[in-house]
């Protein structure tokens, strides 16, 4: 999967400078001399940085809300509410917004669970959340929403490594042994 991301989103697929439209070349850039995309005309360095994803683990009565994805990546697999942080938006605002969009529920963030980072992937920031209102409603990105007790988490059908790691931490924080 990381190889596919590199092919479609990697530095070799960016060909033109966003400032002047000049063609980009690969060049060593100080101070660490890592190879980057550099404009042949204006010398602008185009750093391809990871995107940021904000997610929540909504909790209620000792259970966690999981969403089954109806789109790729991870079609048919389970995760928690989350999505990309929009430009100009804080990570916490994005976490609350994504939860509302994907579940119909409003939440208060109760703390940072953890930050997950994998080469070639977005940085995923996951918060614990308490439901404060709304009506449980799936969206176009998921076809099923379910409250699950720790023993009911479908470890074999989780969508992403970050989903698995975050849920393991959530379960372990309750003094239980995580599955999967």
Segments and roles (model prediction):
Residues 4-7, 59-101, 114:
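Conserved Nudix-box catalytic region and its N-terminal flanking loop in Nudix hydrolases
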Residues 1-14, 166-176, 180:
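A broadly conserved sequence feature marking short terminus-proximal activation segments
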